[in-house]
Amino acid sequence: MVFKAHHRSITRQDIELEDLENAPASIASIENDTLEANVGSTPLTAKQKRNIYFLILLYLIQGVPMGLVRGSIPYFLKPNVSYSDLATYSLAAYPYSLKVLWSPIVDTYYCRSFGRRKTWVVPCMLLISSTLLLFSYNVDTWISKGSSYINSFTTWSFLLVFVCATQDIAVDGWSLNMLNPEQLSYASTAQTVGLNTGFFLSFTILLVFTSPEFANTFIRSIPSNEGLITLSGYIKFWAYFTFIASVLVCFWDESNHQEIANISDMWKTIRAALSLKNMRQLLIVHTLGKVGFVANETLTLLKATEFGLSNEMLSLIILINFPLGLALGVYTGRISNYRPLDIWLKGYWGRVVSILLNTILVYMVSNWKHRFPVFFPIFLCYTLNASFSTIQFVALGVFHSKISDPHIGGTYMTILNTLSNLGGSWPQYVMLRMADLLTVSSCSTAPHLTCSADAQKKECQALGGTCLYKRDGYYLTSIVGIFLAISICVSLITPVVRRLTKAPISSWHIHSKIAETYT
């Protein structure tokens, strides 16, 4: 049966007498409770290692569908859609940015005999499995129709991301109970390895093995028009794999069971958490921290493919970067125990440099593509961008794990991750639409063709014409992004990061209001 705890949650207006009596001790403990304290490294037990591998598996299950939605599907769609269609498709990622709305339900309602987290993880995995299986029978048709089916793609992807986001709430909360407080940085490492591996499989590996050119060049002796695998077959495989993994989760021991507040109190807890001064300042970092990057990072590789970079070469670039990303993620997780936001800030400035290099690269390739070597400059720019993105992602994950209140672990981590995901979702739609609206192009022999999609460009070439760009929205949005990234960081983000780095960990917890009120 479903169990719902009825303990009272603590807010600024609702403080228990026994808490006030213990407040002086709490105040004294805060003195050494700071993010600058390096917790050191404690050896992992065999059970904790198993838990880390288990977390990697759960995050892998999330990473595979997210790699499809955020990685390979836009590339399969690109020949038949415009930037505006891609902007519409980007809305599918919004459940990750809105999951805080239903996180209290995930944290509050569960089957006590089955397990607080397994109650949600197992059904979510089964839904992911069934959704992938159904989609595998329609994906080829939707891709071939392009813009005509963009709404179907977006709707399916939205539902899939919604289920993944719900699972993420439960897994984030579960990770806080699997490891000791001084080892929580491993949770961020597990998340990085799992999500990156899933994304890598659904992006790089998928693009390579669905490519007929790759198979004909390196593997087959007799050429064929099909790759080694099909997109529908790949999706079907992961549907079955996820189902099998869900059976494993059913038998996994879930310890450290905690009874929690009812859903009404959980909503009050969210409101109390969002009312924290630190949280309001962190909101600035999250909502504005990716404004300058999303459009450039999304469009640069797509522009490179327009100028002759094949999907095979793109996959090779990402393939080479994959082990680097994993190693860098593990290393960043270790060094981020001490002042993780400082590490994040260094990654921010690195990304500013990388998007500037991206813009210069695209300009050079577009003007001298017959004399300019495409692969190595793109490889360098992608490596820089991916490395700094990984540094930011892992450092922020460590920071979230350190400041999260274990009493409401799933909900608190969801609040933090929601703020982070929202910062990457809302500017993407705006900037992609801007890039499309600012682009003015036409075909030299058929002015009615706008060359907004690859299919129109091929049609223009078939008519004996070339695409003429009076204005390319890519450069304008990139320049605007660079300006926003620098100005926002200097005026807002850097001062906030300096303040948050010095804040005690207890000041992030709801119960810290007890000591604050007592004093």
Curated annotation (Swiss-Prot):
Q: Has UniProt tagged this entry with the keyword Ubl conjugation? A: no
Where in the cell is the protein located? Membrane
Molecular functions (GO terms): acetyl-CoA transmembrane transporter activity
- GO CC terms for this protein? cytoplasm; Golgi apparatus; membrane
Q: What membrane topology is annotated for this entry?
A: Multi-pass membrane protein
Question: Alphabetically, which GO biological process terms does the record hold?
Answer: acetyl-CoA transmembrane transport
Location (main, coarse): membrane
SUPFAM superfamilies reported for this sequence = MFS general substrate transporter
Where does the sequence pass through the membrane? 52-72, 86-106, 119-139, 156-176, 199-219, 231-251, 313-333, 343-363, 374-394, 408-430, 477-497
Under the heading InterPro entries, the entry gives: AcetylCoA_trans_1-like, AmpG_permease/AT-1, MFS_trans_sf
Per the record, the domain of life is Eukaryota
Keywords in UniProt for this one? Membrane, Transmembrane, Transmembrane helix, Transport
What the entry lists under PANTHER family is as follows: ACETYL-COENZYME A TRANSPORTER 1, SOLUTE CARRIER FAMILY 33 ACETYL-COA TRANSPORTER -RELATED
Q: What is this protein called?
A: Uncharacterized protein C21B10.09
The taxonomy runs: Eukaryota, Fungi, Dikarya, Ascomycota, Taphrinomycotina
